[in-house]
Design a protein with these regions (language model features):
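Phosphate-binding/switch region of NTP-binding enzymes
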Residues: 60-136
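Noncatalytic linker/hinge segments flanking ATPase motor cores
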Residues: 45-55, 100-108, 141-147, 156-159
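Walker B beta-strand of ABC/ABC-like P-loop ATPase nucleotide-binding domains
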Residues: 5-6
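Charged/polar, solvent-exposed surface patches and flexible loops
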Residues: 15, 19, 41-44, 48, ...
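Generic hydrophobic, helix-prone segments enriched in Leu/Val/Ile
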Residues: 17-18, 84, 90, 94, ...
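P-loop NTPase motor core
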Residues: 9-90
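Interfaces that engage single-stranded nucleic acids at replication/repair/recombination sites
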Residues: 123-186
Length: 186
């Protein structure tokens, strides 16, 4: 049975949700409902679908594209920041749902991909609800689960062994399959 849902890409899912809300209300744009009502309906619909999946026990992963944004610094210099290619309103909804808000990338050609989970420089927009998550991990599911469990354990130690979540996730073990046995099953 499946244990997670991967939304690839979140930008397209958000656009479809906006279109659905507009069609349901006979409008062209979410702003047409006035006083933020369209965005409220968008947030409610998005939360209902994806929080509903998490309440059913599924992990939900959102995949999106990056956007490079040049910002002016107070000293007159410019900095290029990396952020999700989402509208600010959509980004706010997604960030509010996310326990981990990371940035997957390669540091150099030929190297393993990494997942940046924290960035003190402010260049990469990312973050996490768990304060002991590492800045970066080699990107794979097992590393993510192990880092998350370690962060939860460290936080629990600070809080008289009270966990910040209801249950621990077991890191998956590598499964190997026998081709002939699988073919016999079919």
């Amino acid at each position: 049975m499946y244990r997670c849902v991967i939304v690839d890409t979140i930008d397209i899912a958000a656009d479809r949700c906006k279109k659905y809300i507009c069609n349901q209300n006979g409008i062209e744009d979410l702003g047409d409902l006035g006083y933020g009502k369209g965005w409220t309906k968008f947030k409610e619909e998005f939360n209902e679908v994806f929080r509903g999946l998490t309440q059913l026990g599924y992990a939900v992963f959102f995949i999106g594209h990056e956007k490079l944004e040049v910002v002016d610094n107070p000293d007159g210099t410019k900095t290029t920041k990396i952020r999700p290619q989402l509208s600010n309103s959509t980004k706010t909804v997604i960030a509010g749902m996310a326990d981990i808000y990371g940035y997957a990338h390669q540091k150099a050609t030929g190297e393993m991909s990494v997942l940046t989970l924290r960035d003190g420089s402010g260049i990469i927009e990312c973050g996490c609800r768990f304060k002991y998550m590492p800045v970066e991990i080699v990107m794979n599911y097992k590393n993510l689960v192990n880092a998350l469990n370690d962060a939860i354990d460290k936080e629990a130690q600070e809080n008289n062994n009270m966990y910040v979540t209801n249950e621990r996730v077991v890191a998956p073990s590598e499964v190997t399959y026998n081709y002939d046995e699988l073919m016999d099953e079919f």
